């Protein structure tokens, strides 16, 4: 029997909720090797925007190269729009709303996305994985964030939590 006088105990924390939305957004990515999602949240825990990595609007992703290796123009790298950038670009409100906002992402942002995050006015980055920590791109990202007072931290407590979503009537 459920005690209706007490709140439910196994609900998602705000961090878990927003990271789950970022992960759900990543499922829209058509990239066969890397799916990344992003969720931007204001200081009142309201979702401002979401994004995922993929081809630019209007670019046919059936002809889009998804390879990771080979001639650079035949790989995904010069064409793909990262999740963080898509989330920033997808927002249709005032950029002023990003002041003091947080961005939740699967993967620590690259240096190009770090610049976008800083320019947007986002003040905190929460990520799940930093698997490219030793790359120049991520080292540069951390230098940029440190110099511009953007805090960042790994969301550790969520690592072993499973959120199951079933779409059925």
Question: What is the predicted function of each stretch?
Answer:
Residues 1-169:
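Zinc-dependent deaminase catalytic domain
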């Amino acid at each position: 029997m459920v005690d209706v006088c007490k709140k439910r105990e196994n609900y998602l924390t705000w961090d878990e909720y927003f990271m789950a939305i970022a992960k759900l957004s990543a499922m829209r990515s058509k990239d066969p090797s890397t799916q990344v999602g992003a969720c931007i949240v204001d200081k009142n825990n309201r979702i401002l925007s979401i994004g995922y990595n993929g081809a630019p609007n209007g670019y046919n992703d059936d002809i889009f190269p998804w390879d990771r290796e080979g001639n650079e123009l035949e790989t995904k790298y010069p064409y793909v729009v990262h999740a963080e950038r898509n989330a920033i670009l997808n927002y249709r409100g005032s950029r002023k709303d990003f002041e003091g906002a947080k961005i939740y992402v699967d993967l620590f942002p690259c240096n190009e996305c770090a610049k976008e995050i800083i320019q947007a006015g986002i003040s905190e980055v929460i990520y799940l994985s930093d698997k490219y920590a030793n790359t120049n791109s991520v080292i540069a990202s951390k230098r940029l964030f440190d110099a511009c007072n953007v805090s960042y931290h790994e969301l550790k407590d969520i690592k072993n939590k499973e959120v199951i979503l079933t779409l059925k009537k």
